[in-house]
Amino acid sequence: MTDSYEVGTVSADGRFDVARPALDLLVWDAPNIDMTLATVIGARPTAASRPRFDAIAAWFVDGAEDPTAPEPPDVEACVFANVPPQHVTSLQRWVEALRSFGYAVFARPKLQPDDDIDQSMLDHISMRAHSNRLRRLVVFSGDGRNFAEPLEDLARAGTEVVVVAFSEVAGYAISSELLQFIDIEDVPGAFAAPLDRVRLDALPADGAWLRPTKSLRDAANLFAARRSA
């Protein structure tokens, strides 16, 4: 992973100052966005159903304000993305939009189907935890395989760790006694309109129907094909 761009105070000899500046850090696992959205709403994501990064940036910065602190913490928001060669042109505009909203973007070519960005995210979090006093860490990811243990370690060390994801896919954060969880749809302005989903953690008193995400015939045909394979 290429060295992250620097924030914070550096002493004359090139080392980070002993009085490490406070930092609120947001990291976002971008490769999961459309896949997770499709799982949650049972349809191909559209522009209207994708999260608004500008609104989320405003929410994150607002959460860094602390009237009791002598000075506000530094704030940094980073999006991590795998870039398939065939999608370079279409992703270029998206990356530039993110940068214009104040996000740093770590982009890496996706050369193999199983290429993952998680370790790059964890490396950056670790670096910031050493170079700064990591006051608050906000992680946009529902992937608990790689994040649960290191995030809980940071929480034990005194960092406020918040996981933002869809409740349908973030069981590791919801069940954790150390991590805070926020459903992404509860972030003010995160979506232009309510998503077509029914949340089990926010059911109406008289109940709600959860529509199938695949037709009954398609599901039966898929089962039959697997059985005969």
Each PLM stretch: what is its role?
Residues 2-115:
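Domain-level signal for Mg2+-assisted phosphodiester chemistry and nucleotide/NA-binding surfaces
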Residues 89-228:
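Nuclease catalytic cores that cleave nucleic-acid phosphodiester bonds
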